[in-house]
Amino acid sequence: MKRWLGMLTLALVACSGPGPYGYARTYRPIAGEEAATRNAKAFDSAMLTEPGRFADVPLNIFGVVRQRGSASTKGHVYLTLSVRRLDDRNLCASANDERTCRLTVSDVSFGEVAVLIELSPEDDEGEHAVGPGSLLRIIGVLGSDFDSVGGGPIVHGTWYRHWPRGQFVTRAQATELRQ
């Protein structure tokens, strides 16, 4: 009986957290995220004009996937991201229920960036795979290689977090999610 109650309590605590998509009023990092982002500098599209200055600087980028290219021979995928800003507070459908909150980013793009990153198997294929409309937080460095379409340097991702379509919102949805 005690064992069963302990397992039930653990299950309830596990279910009440923000989960992998951060259902909370403010941004909640996942395991390993704080370490991955510790020395990262917030991305500014002006960095693409001076890649030499930022070649060894870890960059922190939030972006909505516009295009997903094919995988390279090393298992990395090529992504084009529309750069967004993270809001200080997430939008929620109910002030009393954090489970109705969704990570919120700007509805305006602050430029585009090309990224090469290795995805986990769960994010590479299947229902919630990274693709157009997904949101990613990328930590990476500017490479010495350049995007053949946009012309800018390619960001080589070292860490990422993924929100599939429908698991985040933009400021444009503030009229629907008022809390």
Residue ranges and their predicted role:
Residues 15-179:
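OB-fold and OB-like single-stranded nucleic-acid-recognition modules
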Residues 1-15:
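Sec-dependent bacterial lipoprotein signal peptides
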